[in-house]
Regions:
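Conserved small/polar residues in nucleotide/adenosyl-binding loops
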Residues: 197-199
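Outer-membrane beta-barrel initiation region
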Residues: 28-56
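Transmembrane beta-strands of outer-membrane beta-barrel pores
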Residues: 36-40, 60-62, 69-75, 95-97, ...
């Protein structure tokens, strides 16, 4: 397992080096952010109470990688068990300014002391691997964005141990009221799967 982990990190390092070496003329941007939230709701499903959610991101041209996390403040004193922990890693590529954005993500929220993070075996892993497609209409008066996310591998299994391919769709419309930026969002599950709670 240690050898597999080293191979994954080595491959990622080579890929990043190649990207940096071949696109040095493109703008590079680092993002460091931390949010405090009173409650954590993901895709309409309550996850935890007050949480700290750090973000670390890097983008170069149309390519970006993001590490995002979430942890509540209950720790071992939580009435529902051990503290909630989540780590999401995402790689995304935008196909031009008016094209769609494609993404691949590893979502892990097994929690404190549950599920080994570096276990990627199909029927043992606590990771959910998800592909995403986001498209924003190239219309200034109607900047509606549409997103489809599909869990294609990992812990999203049915009772028979087969992949569920759980999906989540979202429509988002940004607008302003008296210089205050707002978003109207509608999210839905296009079909029922046994692991609906994971969506």
């Amino acid at each position: 397992m240690k050898r597999l982990r080293n191979n994954i990190f080595a491959t990622a390092a080579v890929a990043v080096a190649c990207i940096l070496g071949t696109t040095s003329a493109k703008a590079q941007e680092f993002t460091v952010q931390g949010d405090l939230v009173s409650s954590y709701v993901w895709r309409g499903v309550y996850q935890t109470g007050a949480s700290f959610q750090p973000t670390l991101g890097f983008s170069i041209g149309d390519f970006s990688v993001t590490a995002w996390g979430s942890t509540d403040f209950d720790g071992n004193k939580s009435s529902e068990g051990l503290a909630s922990k989540e780590i999401d890693l995402t790689a995304a590529y935008a196909l031009g300014e008016s094209g769609p954005t494609l993404s691949v993500a590893s979502l892990w929220w097994a929690g404190q002391g549950a599920g080994k993070y570096f276990n990627f075996k199909s029927h043992e892993t606590a990771h959910f691997f998800e592909a995403g497609l986001v498209y924003t209409l190239p219309c200034e008066k109607l900047p509606l964005s549409m997103a489809w996310y599909l869990m294609f591998a990992g812990a999203d299994k049915n009772e028979d141990g087969k992949q569920n391919y759980s999906s989540y769709c979202e429509l988002n419309y940004p607008f302003s009221v008296k210089s205050v930026d707002l978003n109207a969002t509608v999210g839905f599950v296009p079909y029922k799967t046994l692991s609906l709670i994971h969506i």
